[in-house]
Curated annotation (Swiss-Prot):
The keyword Repeat applies. Keywords: Repeat, WD repeat. Residues 120-132, 604-614 have a biased composition (Acidic residues). Residues 36-55, 508-533 have a biased composition (Basic and acidic residues). It holds the Pfam family WD40. PANTHER family: GASTRULATION DEFECTIVE PROTEIN 1-RELATED, WD REPEAT-CONTAINING PROTEIN 70. The keyword Transmembrane does not apply. Residues 539-549 have a biased composition (Gly residues). InterPro entries: G-protein_beta_WD-40_rep, WD40/YVTN_repeat-like_dom_sf, WD40_repeat_dom_sf, WD40_rpt, WD_repeat_GAD-1. This is WD repeat-containing protein 70. PROSITE patterns: WD_REPEATS_1 (PS00678), WD_REPEATS_2 (PS50082), WD_REPEATS_REGION (PS50294).
Amino acid sequence: MDENEDSSIAATMGFSGFGKKARTFDLEAMFEQTRRTAVERSKQTLEAREKEEQLSNKSPVIKGAPSSSGQKKTKASGSSSGSEDSSDDELIGPPLPPNVTGDHGDELIGPPLPPGYKDSDDEDDEEHEDDDNPVKDIPDSHEITLQHGTKTVSALGLDPSGARLVTGGYDYDVRFWDFAGMDASLQAFRSLQPCECHQIKSLQYSNTGDVILVVAGNSQAKVLDRDGFPVMECVKGDQYIVDMANTKGHTAMLNGGCWHPKIKEEFMTCSNDGTVRTWDVSNEKKHKGIFKPRSVQGKPVIPTCCTYSRDGKFIAAGCQDGSIQIWDRNMSVHTKFHCRQAHTPGTDTSCVTFSYGGNVLATRGGDDTLKTWDIRKFKNPLNVASGLENFFPMTDCCFSPDDKLLITGTSVKRGIGDGKLLFFDVVTFQKIYEIQVTEASVVRCLWHPKLNQIMVGTGNGLAKVYYDPNRSQRGAKLCVVKTQRKERQAETLTQDYIITPHALPMFREPRQRSTRKQLEKDRLDPVKSHKPEPPVAGPGRGGRVGTHGGTLSSFIVKNIALDKTDDSNAREAILRHAKDAEQNPYWVAPAYSKTQPNTVFAEVDSDEEEPDNEPEWKKRKI
């Protein structure tokens, strides 16, 4: 009925029909044909593989020839079988690619795969290969250079969020860098000298990022806020007390310091006075705890570096006698672990750091070595790398965020070679990568886990930041995309003003004044009138000595040395009272008035002649 209506409508409108009729397909027949073709091709593939195995067993030395002959035979057999099948059934679809026919030994069911298709198993294998290669995780494709100064950058610190970088050096300066606020000019937004003329040894942000620990060459560590303003300063101990446990603070130069990873108010410092002390930000008057490293003989040794474990339970210190000593944070008397011969005695161990896992300890020694230790088996090192020159007492080493790599820098003499940043595999301890940084020593290195960027401090005053645009986050990527701000040009005058020379004050001639007024003015001037200086009343001043007696001390000095000698005749002074004593006796005369009324005086005899029998040494010398 519908067909008749369509034909009548088409005839009325003047054309033969509304279009071609839709073709119909027999899906079952097509599926059966495809299945048959797939089975036949699978058989051909199996036959070709069996022939290849037979040929390879006969001639095992030649590996390339059987595969090519096998492919030729496969093609030939495929063409012959295809010619035989073409007489019976028609092949539907394109032939399978050679990689599919040669790789899959199972029965192929379904239509052929495209030539560029890769199985999911192959993709997983490639991903595993990429994961096994740690070199690809090193973010060093791009770099920026921050000019700190001209002297060694001896301290680096990056806050936990990665927004601000702080650098310190041998020039006593501490510079603050804000990645979000910097442009392509890469200028620091603040520079200061918190410890005056002392070299900066260490800088570190707290785990909250609100304060910075500054350790310099003096004996008092400082804590600054994010903008560089002082928060607290540790007290200095009494250097005349022998027992360092009884002093309230350090008495000698500091060597290092760091924050507690869990407690935001606690930090630690080590010093040349032979102690490691813990402090609380809220109490600057006295240290919180003290640890005293000892040598084999029980004598105090100097700790050159110190650090906390990742969980904050242990405190580790590298000492000048080559030992590494680890204490439990709650027990300061005896060490928990120690290794006496970790490094060469007499050298400064420049860095001690824990891995993110917490069981592996890495040490950078002054004996040009880098070692890793398992604190559970602390007698012998896990791995040792030697020949890494170290000229600085703060040369760093640090772990990558995934604990697969260990990085450190090398020192070079001026003008001889380039300083390098070396990457070691933690397991095999093979050097797998290196970066030539600059023509100076590499002192500090820092790999931030959130930014995935590497910061390096060098011996020529540079701080370099290495990053990868694809793998790194924020940090240096924020400032390199900003254009450098143009300097503001001085505003020019839109209209030129003509100024007469004599209108300016410097060209004006002074007006003539009367002589009388000038004389009166000179008379009031004590210098021009030669006025004599008035006498000084009271104590002296201005280099002039005051009058005597102005003060109590001067009055005493004036009167204490007076000449009090009596020039009067003593005999006349006594005889003045003779008449009164004779008429009114009071002391001696009444006692002798009855027994001896008349006074009897001693008779004056002439000098007796000296006997001649006396020895010469007894005779009086006249």
